[in-house]
Amino acid sequence: MDTVSLPQLPATVLVTIAKLVAPADLVSLCDSHPQLVFLRLYLPEFQDIPVGSFRKYGPSDGHFCPELYFTSPVVHQRVGSITLTFRWKDQGFGNRKGMLWIELVREGQLIATSKDDFPTLAPHQEETQEIVIRNHPVVDLIRKGDTINFMRNVGGGGGHSLSVQEFNAKLELYKY
């Protein structure tokens, strides 16, 4: 039996394979041979990361007490923008300290953060937010293999809480 390399397969077979494999595997396949680059057309344009909801109470001491909310799956494509949508509010009175932001992480090292550029504090009354991040280092510097940390600060000092409902992150992905 003769051996056939992937680039020698008919385009219809390669397209079928591209439609069936996970995006991370398709990126690896495309990177494996110059004649397979056309299969990038079958990469997704968006990646939704639905997370859900939480209600968190802050510690009795401290003011800024950042913590990891969750980490994204490993990114396999370049990213054009990140859109965060959610409903949120704090405890409803007193000082406002609740915050959400993202951090770009590569091999365990912080590369960029959006904390100082999107310093919105949670309101006393529930609000719906849509934050679109583009042309910012947390997006522009993303490379294959990176992760995105989604961070939160409830705020310390007693009585602080942060409630986030229906949190979703949507990554706009580049195919090339």
Describe each PLM feature range.
Residues 34-36, 89, 107-109, 155-156, ...:
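Conserved beta-strand elements of beta-rich interaction domains across eukaryotes
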Residues 124-128, 141-147:
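Glycine-centered loop/turn motifs
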Residues 68-78, 136-142, 176:
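Extracellular and analogous surface-interaction loops
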Residues 83-84, 98-103, 143, 147-176:
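Exposed low-complexity, polar/acidic, P/S/T/G-rich flexible segments that act as propeptides
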Residues 130-140, 156-157:
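Signal that preferentially marks extracellular ectodomain short beta-strand elements
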Residues 96-133:
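Terminal beta-strand-rich extracellular "head" domains
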Residues 37-99:
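Solvent-exposed, flexible loop/coil segments flanking beta-strands in beta-rich domains
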Residues 1-42:
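N-terminal Skp1-binding subsegment of the F-box domain
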